[in-house]
Swiss-Prot record:
NCBIfam families: L21. GO terms for molecular function: rRNA binding; structural constituent of ribosome. Belongs to the bacterial ribosomal protein bL21 family. PANTHER family: 50S RIBOSOMAL PROTEIN L21, LARGE RIBOSOMAL SUBUNIT PROTEIN BL21M. It comes from Prosthecochloris aestuarii (strain DSM 271 / SK 413). This is Large ribosomal subunit protein bL21. GO terms for biological process: translation. Pfam families: Ribosomal_L21p. Part of the 50S ribosomal subunit. Contacts protein L20. Keywords: Ribonucleoprotein, Ribosomal protein, RNA-binding, rRNA-binding. GO terms for cellular component: cytoplasm; ribonucleoprotein complex; ribosome. This protein binds to 23S rRNA in the presence of protein L20. SUPFAM superfamilies: L21p-like.
């Protein structure tokens, strides 16, 4: 069984046992979160507005890979280099 869930305006197709990286959530490591699915997909049918919740467990909080932003103005000797690392949360899907 699969489910389509929405977390922080992003959609994920998940099934039990999946581990995924989502935008940082205000939860402690080890907490179990309940998320309402948008679509439930069985082998034979698809249910819109399904009943029940998807339970995910917070495994860790971490930062994503660095993205470098480089600005330059030609002939003016202006250069600016900034880096950014997005904060993320790693979760595991427990049950549906």
């Amino acid at each position: 069984m699969q489910a389509l869930i929405e977390i922080s305006d992003k959609q994920y197709l998940v099934q039990p046992g999946d581990e995924l990286f989502i935008p940082r959530q205000q939860a402690e490591v080890g907490d179990v979160l309940d998320i309402k699915p948008m679509v439930a997909i069985d082998q034979e049918n698809t249910t819109l507005q399904p009943s029940g919740n998807v339970q995910v467990k917070v495994l860790e909080h971490l930062k994503g890979e660095k993205v470098v932003v480089f600005k330059k103005k030609r002939r003016k000797r202006y250069q600016c280099r900034n880096g950014h690392r997005q904060q993320m949360t790693k979760v595991e899907v427990l049950s549906m």
